[in-house]
C-alpha cells in the first residue's frame, strides 16, 4: 500500500498578501527575521506558502492581540 502525504494547500504570494494585508517586501522581511512561515520552492522562480501555516500564524497574531 502506497503512503500518501497529508493534503496541504499551497497558496501564492498574492493570496498571502490578501490574507495578511502585508506587502511583499514586509512578508519577506518577516521571513528573513524568522517571524513568518517560510515559503516552499516550487521551481527555479516559483514559490508558494502552506495555507495552514499562514492560517496558524494569523491566529497567533489574533490571540496575542487579545491577550494584551
Specify the residue positions occupied by each region the protein language model found.
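Polyanion-binding surface elements
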Residues: 2-26, 32, 53-63
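Extracellular beta-propeller repeat domains
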Residues: 67-68
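Major-groove DNA-recognition helix of helix-turn-helix-type DNA-binding domains
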Residues: 20-48
Amino acid at each position: 500500500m502506497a503512503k500518501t502525504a497529508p493534503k496541504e494547500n499551497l497558496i501564492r504570494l498574492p493570496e498571502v498578501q490578501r490574507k495578511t494585508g502585508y506587502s511583499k517586501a514586509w512578508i519577506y522581511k518577516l521571513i528573513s527575521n524568522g517571524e513568518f512561515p517560510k515559503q516552499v520552492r516550487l521551481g527555479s522562480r516559483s514559490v508558494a506558502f502552506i495555507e495552514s501555516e499562514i492560517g496558524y500564524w494569523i491566529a497567533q497574531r489574533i490571540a496575542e492581540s487579545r491577550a494584551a
